[in-house]
Amino acid sequence: MIETLLPASALAFPAIDPVIFRIGPLAVHWYGLGYVVGILFAWWYGKKLLRSHRLWANNQPPMAPEALDDFVIWAALGVVLGGRIGYVLFYNFSYYISNPLAIPALWDGGMSFHGGILGTTLAMILFARSRGILVWSMFDTIAAGVPIGLGVVRVANFINSELWGRVSDVPWAVYFPNGGPLPRHPSQLYEAFLEGLVLFFVLFVLVWGARKLKQPGFVAGAFVTGYGLSRIAVEFFREPDAQIGYLFGGWLTMGMVLSVPMVLLGLWAMWRANRAAARNA
């Protein structure tokens, strides 16, 4: 019955070329641009926060704004290497263990946000320790601007017609070119809204309104918790990766499994930051 109703209520997929422009053999994709925009925005916004001395404990930023100029390369390597290795380990290990030469083929797709955040976290720890910067404040500085990049990348996922949602009869369901004959939830846009706009707004209020940068680790904890909760919510509408499917009961996905520890870790980081602030009060 639902199959007969779906076609009349769904939306056609917008004809947007995944390639923005070409220069000879070089093709610039929306997906790649999303990562560039995300890194550059986090860099710019982080420097803005560091220049606003009143946001930090004792009006003393944890580092000079110029330090982020050096961190950009570290961040890019952490995102790309962590994202790729995470995808290989979490989502398609059996394929890549049999085809190791395919691991560096980033142009064929396959990145994991959970791997990307692990790679970036490692880069932040190494960078902060090499410069004598408080690690928790380093986390806060970067985390505050990350949601914008997440939102842009999710929109790029939509343009690429990838990571689409489950079959649905909602009026805004979309016929994806490679998503089969039935319309699906545009779950990429749900993620762009929750992980991008909503999460950035929450962190913006915590930073500029509640002045939570004065409590090292709180903003980073809020980001990790917010992302984890957003991802878990959207996983109920997102089609699981074909090579994995559901892990349990027709509802549990790998995205959920990887996000639950993030929520717990983020809650712990916020609790720790509040407790430290209370002790120093």
Curated annotation (Swiss-Prot):
Belongs to the Lgt family. Its EC number is 2.5.1.145. The lineage of its organism: Bacteria, Pseudomonadati, Pseudomonadota, Alphaproteobacteria, Hyphomicrobiales. InterPro entries: Lgt (IPR001640). It is found in: Cell inner membrane. The chain crosses the membrane at residues 23-43, 71-91, 107-127, 133-153, 189-209, 217-237, 247-267. Pathway: Protein modification; lipoprotein biosynthesis (diacylglyceryl transfer). The gene is lgt. GO terms for biological process: lipoprotein biosynthetic process. It comes from the Bacteria. This is Phosphatidylglycerol--prolipoprotein diacylglyceryl transferase. Catalyzes the transfer of the diacylglyceryl group from phosphatidylglycerol to the sulfhydryl group of the N-terminal cysteine of a prolipoprotein, the first step in the formation of mature lipoproteins. Signal peptide: none annotated. A 1,2-diacyl-sn-glycero-3-phospho-(1'-sn-glycerol) binds at R154. GO terms for cellular component: plasma membrane. It is an enzyme of class 2 (transferase). GO terms for molecular function: phosphatidylglycerol-prolipoprotein diacylglyceryl transferase activity. Pfam families: LGT. Keywords: Cell inner membrane, Cell membrane, Membrane, Transferase, Transmembrane, Transmembrane helix. It is a multi-pass membrane protein.
